[in-house]
């Protein structure tokens, strides 16, 4: 039995959730609105200020979707109330980030600066030249944009230079040893 799927989701004050006929869930809150369509087999019920997700059978596919559906709706509720943020650090001599208008410009050792434009709904902050913070209400889009930034110059294992997530531990390798 899915423990996450069985958990009842408390709907906080100021958040409204609507479920359409085709299992499209719309969550409105103080920070914005998110909409997502879920598998038609899952039963999403709203009673007063709680939401429950039920599965029709014990088939492997339904068991897998049960917890996933509950977790995704939980993330939608958290996004419209608190929002999500993902931090990145730039490690390396001369590695810098700066914001020019709505673009993020990265100087990470290439012959040219790398320009990235966040999609609508995402906010990029550069509190320091070596720190980047991505904020938004959709957890998946925040994480995806952070991963795209990290992929520009992923941390290398010898010196640890590159763009890493805040708090990420880069596994280091030893260099060659002389004979």
From Swiss-Prot:
SUPFAM superfamilies: Ribosomal protein L6 (SSF56053)
GO cellular component: cytosolic large ribosomal subunit
GO molecular function annotations of the record: rRNA binding; structural constituent of ribosome
Alphabetized UniProt keyword annotations: Ribonucleoprotein, Ribosomal protein, RNA-binding, rRNA-binding
Source species, domain of life: Bacteria
Keyword Lipid biosynthesis: no
One example of a Gene Ontology biological process annotation: cytoplasmic translation
Listed InterPro entries: Ribosomal_uL6-like, Ribosomal_uL6-like_a/b-dom_sf, Ribosomal_uL6_a/b-dom, Ribosomal_uL6_bac-type, Ribosomal_uL6_CS
Gene3D superfamilies attached to this UniProt entry: Ribosomal protein L6, alpha-beta domain
The keyword RNA-binding is annotated on this UniProt entry: yes
A Pfam family per the record: Ribosomal_L6
Role played: This protein binds to the 23S rRNA, and is important in its secondary structure. It is located near the subunit interface in the base of the L7/L12 stalk, and near the tRNA binding site of the peptidyltransferase center.
Self-association and partners: Part of the 50S ribosomal subunit.
HAMAP family, per the entry: Ribosomal_uL6_B
Family of the protein in this entry: Belongs to the universal ribosomal protein uL6 family.
Protein name in UniProt: Large ribosomal subunit protein uL6
Organism encoding this protein: Bacillus cereus (strain ATCC 14579 / DSM 31 / CCUG 7414 / JCM 2152 / NBRC 15305 / NCIMB 9373 / NCTC 2599 / NRRL B-3711)
